[in-house]
Amino acid sequence: MVTVLIAGGGTGGHVFPMIAVGDAVRAAARDEEARVVYVGTARGIEVRVMGERGDNLELLHVLPLRGGGLSGFVRGAARAGSVLPEARRLVERLDARVALSLGGYAGGPVSLAARSLGVPVAILEPNSVLGLSNRLLAPIVDRAYVAFPETARALRPSTVRLFGVPLRRAFARAPYAPREGALRLLVLGGSQGALALNDVVPRAIARGRERGADLEVVHQTGRDREAAVRALYAELGLAGRARVVPFIDDVAEALAAADVVIARAGASTLAELCAVGRPSILIPYPFAADNHQLRNAQSLERASAAVAIAQGDATELRLADEIARLAAAPALRARMADAAAAFATRDAAARVAADLLELARAPRHRALRFPTLGGRAARAGEAQRGAVTNQAAPLGAGLGWEEAG
């Protein structure tokens, strides 16, 4: 049996590509039995999504280094000293043959642990800019699966595979035919919703209708925000025109039914709307790491597949203008849909899966010891696992490793 570890999670932008690759690995293995084990944290949506699917999910006890201020950083850094040995025990127990990281809080520790044991390591970066975890892992990986050509410039050429964003099999091209009746809008703020979209989009739709546009909307609000958004639509006189839901389980079906999508610009969301082939108005999340959502959105805008509006410029008036313009221009919407579909890579999951299985069958590397961690937490981890060492030589982007004898 070949065991493939797929680590990441936290948001739908990680979880759904993880699922897509895992499903493709099992399909590609054919006569060779393949076990897919996902690794995430208790803080992410993977617990619910993968739990409902009955997937094999392991959880690491990881604290974030970003977003918690100085105290949060200190707690997360201290915890890192014990997370690496925890991840190493996990890799050993499962006898993993290859590890794939999508970044995030689980991806880094699992990849470092796998590499320390000689297990081949791959990263998958769906965004146009490498995330922090993948950027740090880049010097030690065997493969780097990317979706944007510009991402490759930050990676060793021999490792790069330009495969696109892995998607679940449900996402397929849906013919785009402008039709009579109301323009159907789909609002996606990501798996956790988007406060800014929850406020400005209903107001923009109300203004668009004042200008004569016939509009209907399905609005994904994120959990715990449904009631407030539903109340806002009612206040604006749109209760009969809006279907408000906290989370859309079948996004592929919702995209196929939409005429225009209003969304953030996470890579998975963009890959999904391109696979189905839908025009979009994109409002990138301005606080995404390295502002990667803005670059994602600009890539689609350059391809004439989307309208990109920075959040600071996304007033209800500006958004109403764009909605009304697209509502009045069915030919433009059709051209944008074709451009989006041309941007899609529908076989990414299968290509990643085939390559991962090839890595899994390859001979293992020579084992490496953990990088220097420093501090009390690292010394505690060293006491737990003799493999942890503070004697290390620098490699690449600050990662220190020592070959095990």
UniProtKB/Swiss-Prot annotation:
<keyword id="KW-0132">Cell division</keyword>
<dbReference type="GO" id="GO:0030259">
    <property type="term" value="P:lipid glycosylation"/>
</dbReference>
<dbReference type="InterPro" id="IPR006009">
    <property type="entry name" value="GlcNAc_MurG"/>
</dbReference>
<feature type="binding site">
    <location>
        <position position="293"/>
    </location>
    <ligand>
        <name>UDP-N-acetyl-alpha-D-glucosamine</name>
    </ligand>
</feature>
<keyword id="KW-1003">Cell membrane</keyword>
<keyword id="KW-0961">Cell wall biogenesis/degradation</keyword>
<comment type="similarity">
    <text>Belongs to the glycosyltransferase 28 family. MurG subfamily.</text>
</comment>
<dbReference type="GO" id="GO:0051301">
    <property type="term" value="P:cell division"/>
</dbReference>
<comment type="pathway">
    <text>Cell wall biogenesis; peptidoglycan biosynthesis.</text>
</comment>
<feature type="binding site">
    <location>
        <position position="168"/>
    </location>
    <ligand>
        <name>UDP-N-acetyl-alpha-D-glucosamine</name>
    </ligand>
</feature>
<feature type="binding site">
    <location>
        <begin position="11"/>
        <end position="13"/>
    </location>
    <ligand>
        <name>UDP-N-acetyl-alpha-D-glucosamine</name>
    </ligand>
</feature>
<feature type="binding site">
    <location>
        <position position="248"/>
    </location>
    <ligand>
        <name>UDP-N-acetyl-alpha-D-glucosamine</name>
    </ligand>
</feature>
<dbReference type="GO" id="GO:0005886">
    <property type="term" value="C:plasma membrane"/>
</dbReference>
<dbReference type="GO" id="GO:0009252">
    <property type="term" value="P:peptidoglycan biosynthetic process"/>
</dbReference>
<dbReference type="GO" id="GO:0008360">
    <property type="term" value="P:regulation of cell shape"/>
</dbReference>
<dbReference type="Pfam" id="PF03033">
    <property type="entry name" value="Glyco_transf_28"/>
</dbReference>
<dbReference type="InterPro" id="IPR004276">
    <property type="entry name" value="GlycoTrans_28_N"/>
</dbReference>
<dbReference type="GO" id="GO:0050511">
    <property type="term" value="F:undecaprenyldiphospho-muramoylpentapeptide beta-N-acetylglucosaminyltransferase activity"/>
</dbReference>
<dbReference type="GO" id="GO:0005975">
    <property type="term" value="P:carbohydrate metabolic process"/>
</dbReference>
<dbReference type="InterPro" id="IPR007235">
    <property type="entry name" value="Glyco_trans_28_C"/>
</dbReference>
<feature type="binding site">
    <location>
        <position position="191"/>
    </location>
    <ligand>
        <name>UDP-N-acetyl-alpha-D-glucosamine</name>
    </ligand>
</feature>
<comment type="function">
    <text>Cell wall formation. Catalyzes the transfer of a GlcNAc subunit on undecaprenyl-pyrophosphoryl-MurNAc-pentapeptide (lipid intermediate I) to form undecaprenyl-pyrophosphoryl-MurNAc-(pentapeptide)GlcNAc (lipid intermediate II).</text>
</comment>
<keyword id="KW-0573">Peptidoglycan synthesis</keyword>
<keyword id="KW-0133">Cell shape</keyword>
<keyword id="KW-0131">Cell cycle</keyword>
<keyword id="KW-0328">Glycosyltransferase</keyword>
<keyword id="KW-0997">Cell inner membrane</keyword>
<dbReference type="Pfam" id="PF04101">
    <property type="entry name" value="Glyco_tran_28_C"/>
</dbReference>
<feature type="binding site">
    <location>
        <position position="127"/>
    </location>
    <ligand>
        <name>UDP-N-acetyl-alpha-D-glucosamine</name>
    </ligand>
</feature>
<keyword id="KW-0472">Membrane</keyword>
<dbReference type="GO" id="GO:0071555">
    <property type="term" value="P:cell wall organization"/>
</dbReference>
<keyword id="KW-0808">Transferase</keyword>
<dbReference type="GO" id="GO:0051991">
    <property type="term" value="F:UDP-N-acetyl-D-glucosamine:N-acetylmuramoyl-L-alanyl-D-glutamyl-meso-2,6-diaminopimelyl-D-alanyl-D-alanine-diphosphoundecaprenol 4-beta-N-acetylglucosaminlytransferase activity"/>
</dbReference>
<protein>
    <recommendedName>
        <fullName>UDP-N-acetylglucosamine--N-acetylmuramyl-(pentapeptide) pyrophosphoryl-undecaprenol N-acetylglucosamine transferase</fullName>
        <ecNumber>2.4.1.227</ecNumber>
    </recommendedName>
</protein>
